Amino acid sequence: MIKTLLIAPIRFYRFFLSPWIGRQCRFTPSCSAYAIEAIERHGALRGLWLASRRIGRCHPWSPGGLDPVPDPARPQQKNQGSGCCGNHSRTGLD
């Protein structure tokens, strides 16, 4: 429900205001498309954070270009990876 409430004004902008303003975004996908995808994929809080950061980067001095929404982080599995406390294996060189 919160996602729908956040996405509704973005869709309003895309369909009613954006045609009057013209394509101004320097990025692909556009900032409004990025915001919708970020909210749908990452949830309300993280999606808004990602969208806000993207809009902050969209200015006349930005080179723009391809900037897709990052993939959601997968939860780390216990005792996997290369942390200070993971993968304790003895090599016989102790």
From Swiss-Prot:
SMART domains linked to this entry: Haemolytic
Residues covered by region (Disordered): 61-94
GO cellular component, one term: plasma membrane
Pfam families recorded: YidD
Subcellular localization: Cell inner membrane
Key words of the record: Cell inner membrane, Cell membrane, Membrane
Highest taxon in the source lineage: Bacteria
Entry membrane topology: Peripheral membrane protein
Major localization class: membrane
Family that this chain belongs to: Belongs to the UPF0161 family.
Function field: Could be involved in insertion of integral membrane proteins into the membrane.
Name used for this protein in its record: Putative membrane protein insertion efficiency factor
Species name: Bordetella avium (strain 197N)
